[in-house]
Structure formats: structure tokens, C-alpha cells
Amino acid sequence: MNKFLLFFMSVLVCATAKALDFTVDGVNYQLISSEEQTCKVVSGNYSGAVVIPATVNYGGRDLKVIEMADQTLCNTYDVTSVVLGSNLKKIGKNCLVNLKIETLTIPGSVTEIGDYSLSLSKLKKLVIEPSGEEDNPTAISIGIFEETVNYTKYKRPITQRLKSLESLELYRDLSCNKSGLFQELPLQSVIIGGDAAVKSEMFYECVNLHSLEFTDDATFGHFGRGIGSEAFYHCPLEGEITFPAAIQGFGDRCFSGNHFSAIHFENTTGFSIGAGAFSRSENITSLIIPEAVTMIGRNAFSSCKNLKNLRIETNGELKEAALCGNDYDVVTFTANCTQNMIAASLAGEISSGNTIVDFSPAKIKDLHVNAPVPPKQFVDFHGKTWGFTEDQYVLTTLYVPAGSLEAYKSAEVWKNFWNIKADPSAGIEDVEADAEAEEGPVKWYNLNGQLIDNPTTKGIYIKHVNNKSTKVIVP
């Protein structure tokens, strides 16, 4: 009798504990908490357009839909579109698998997407909305999947399963214990905004990716606030790009192999440029590295085959071979640049001739060094000075401030140049093109120091009036 009573009570408890299932408008739900009035969507025989609402009315109560149970919308091949509600927090394992949908928006409320989800071979556009917590935005935890390649198993982010993805709008930070979130996908355009962080290898070798845009509110996440190493490695990004002030660093090789036509930096408070960050930027023809740069890494701008005019306005740290592998018309170091690695950044060789670079030394027609005092160049622990190459000494014309000409002609390293000339543009001040003109004869020079007529095209020119030179920017 006691055994029978015990069995009966256990069955009663199980029946009482069983979650309440219900269906509204063709969507199956399961109650999570009657007290908190929450529920989750569960699997079912779905087809066509599926809408998961923010709330669902059941028993006269509006229940928040906060979860998709494991295997919801899994292998429901006839589903053509999915709308996810604004209260959804968790997308379980094996959800959103093998659907016919071409677009998907992940709402800002979602904090977790489980393993083996998002197997959407036809998805072309993905939008990940900003976090619903504006004051303290949280990242979305991204699950992984396992695949076997040549008998070897690899664990990868589930986002790599989106094999037809062409467009991504990312306004949220994504967290995953595997790198390469969108690696090697057929993406064509990417928009980055909100607190989305651009992490290492995130878009590695997306060889169809031509368009990249940053929104005005982009903060690049809470940690690092930069572009991760190899984030856009070998992505043929095109057009003129301005990097927002929020970016505090560019990781190693992050934009190596891009097709940008022009690069601009808005940060005025300090940022670093990692090794090879913009190497093989084949379409840029001129570049200004602003004063805010704190470090230019090894090979950072190497092998930019069409880069002809380079202006370095920073006295930040220069690494060896940072500017190698290019064929320059003009390279200018402004008056504040007294770095001891100027030679090493362009030559990449020490005085003994032992190479330390991945690219060939730069070819330079005209080198402008505007520091009033010749910068002393690096001496290694062997006592050897890192100088320029023999070809650079012979073939490059060195322009220096007129008042410092004799000092350069007698200074270590600099005295080895065969052609050293006074630079009429050295030591000038910056003014706008519409600044009030001074009285007296006016002479105009280009940045090569050549006398010209009044400038009529867009660019930077040198105006010489009453023994005073100023830089004029013609917009």
C-alpha cells in the first residue's frame, strides 16, 4: 500500500510540474514562469511567414516571449520568413536551421545564440540590432559548430554557416570563443555601428567585400576600441574611407590588401597602427599620417605600389621597415618629427647590410626632413647605426630647412646623401586657403619645393610672403 501511494504521488508531482503548452496564431509556446509571466517558443510544423511576437496573450495575460527552445525552426524547410520579437533573449541550440529565408534581423534584446544554430544557406542579409541596454550594452554570446575537413574536426563560430551572406549590418558586440566570425563569407557590404567591436580575423579573406561603412555612433566595443588583427585581411575594400575618432588602434595586418583609394583618420587624441596594418594598399596615391599616431608598426604601409606622396606629421614611434617597399615621389617628415628610426623605416637595413624586412627598401625621389636639428638615427647594441641604403643615398634628393643645411651636411647618416638642398617649405605654419593675405610679393611652391603659378586645383601649397612661408590648403 505504501509503495502504491508513493508511486501515485510521484506521478501526480510530475504531472503538476509538466510545463504548460499552448498554441496561438499557429505558433507553439511553453510557459516558463507564471509568476514572471514569461514563455518560450517551441518546435512545430511551421511554414510560410513565421512571426514570433514580443508578447502573446494567453489566459487573459500578456506573456513575454523571451526564448526559442532548442530545435525551434529546425529543418522546417517551408518557412520563407521569420520575425523575432523584441523581448527575445535566448535562441537555443539548433534553432533557425535549414529555412528558406533570405533576410533576418536579430533584435537588441538577444544575449545568446546557441550551438549549431543559424544554418541558413540562403540567407543574404543579416541585421544585428543595437543592444536594448543603452547605458550598459551587452554582447551576444555566439555558439559554435563542428565540421570535419580532410578527416580533421574543427570548431568554428556558427556565423560561418551563412554561406550565402552578402550584406551585414552590425550594431552589437559579438562574443565567441572562436575567432573569424564571418571569415571567408561572400559578403559584399558591411556596416559597423553602435558598440560592435571589430575583432581579430572577423572578416578574414572575404574576397567579395568591397564596401565598408562606419556609422556616426560607432564606439567599437568596450575593450580595445580598435580594429583587430587581420580583421579585414585581403578584403578588396574600395573607395575613400575616413576612420572614426573612436578607433584607438589598428591591429596587425588588419587592412592588408585593401583597394581603398584614400585613407583619412579622425582621431586627434592618440592611436597606433600595427605591423602590416595597411600593407599592400595598392590604390592609394597620397597619405597623411597625423600627429595623433603614437606608433607605426613594422611594414605598416609597405608595398603600397601607387603611393607617391607621403607626409608624416607624428613624432610617434616608428618601427623598422614601416614605410618600405614603395616607390615615392615625395616623402615629408614635419618639423616635430625627430624620430631615430626615420632611416630604418624607409631602408629596413642596418649599416652592415643585413636585411630585417619583408619588403624591399623604398625608392624615394625627394625626401623632406623639416626638423631644425638633424635627427640622430638608431644605434644598435653592436654600435652600428641604422642608416639608409646606398641607392637611397645616391638617388634621393634630401631637402632640409635652409638654416640647417650645413648641419645636415655634417651630421651622421644625413651627410651621406649626395644631393642635399634647402627646402623652402620647411618650418612653415598651417593656414586655411581663405586666410587674410599679407602685403608683398607672393611666391607659390608645391610640396616638392618647385615654384608654380597661383594654385588653381585642390591640394596643399606653400605661400612665401615677406620672408615667411605658410602652408595653404586649397579645398
Indicate residue ranges for each PLM-predicted region:
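C-terminal tail/sorting-segment detector
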Residues: 1-3, 462-475
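Structural signature of tandem-repeat unit edges
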Residues: 24-26, 45-66, 77-90, 99-112, ...
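Consensus positions within tandem repeat domains that build extended binding/scaffold surfaces
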Residues: 71-72, 92-95, 114-117, 143-144, ...
